[in-house]
Amino acid sequence: MEARAVAKYIRISPRKARQVIDLIRGKDVEEALAILRYTPKKASYFIEKVLRSAIANAENNHDMSKENLYVAKAYVDQGPTLKRYNPRAQGRVDLWRVRTSHITIVVAERKEG
């Protein structure tokens, strides 16, 4: 049995979020939460929030125990890019691309034995 949680349109670059999400893939949820709590990156806050949501979904919707859960799948997809303009000298304009991410975490029960 699996439980999942998705956060969409998070205003962080997918490349930066993938650096953090690679740290927790395949780990027990308690270990993953500890890693995220002490990782000094902006993405770790959002990923921890999604992981806690996935754990709550597993406990409340699927009657799984938190002790047996692990991060089965964790991935970051690219969301839409917001375009912003930055005025420059002599009437020119620079384009800022604000990248967004869709973060998905799937937790499952580890088979005992």
Swiss-Prot record:
The keyword rRNA-binding applies. One of its GO terms (cellular component) is cytosolic large ribosomal subunit. GO terms for molecular function: rRNA binding; structural constituent of ribosome. Belongs to the universal ribosomal protein uL22 family. It holds the Pfam family Ribosomal_L22. This protein binds specifically to 23S rRNA; its binding is stimulated by other ribosomal proteins, e.g. L4, L17, and L20. It is important during the early stages of 50S assembly. It makes multiple contacts with different domains of the 23S rRNA in the assembled 50S subunit and ribosome. One of its GO terms (biological process) is translation. Keywords: Ribonucleoprotein, Ribosomal protein, RNA-binding, rRNA-binding. It comes from Carboxydothermus hydrogenoformans (strain ATCC BAA-161 / DSM 6008 / Z-2901). CDD domains: Ribosomal_L22 (cd00336). This is Large ribosomal subunit protein uL22. PROSITE patterns: RIBOSOMAL_L22. The keyword Metal-binding does not apply. Part of the 50S ribosomal subunit. The gene is rplV.
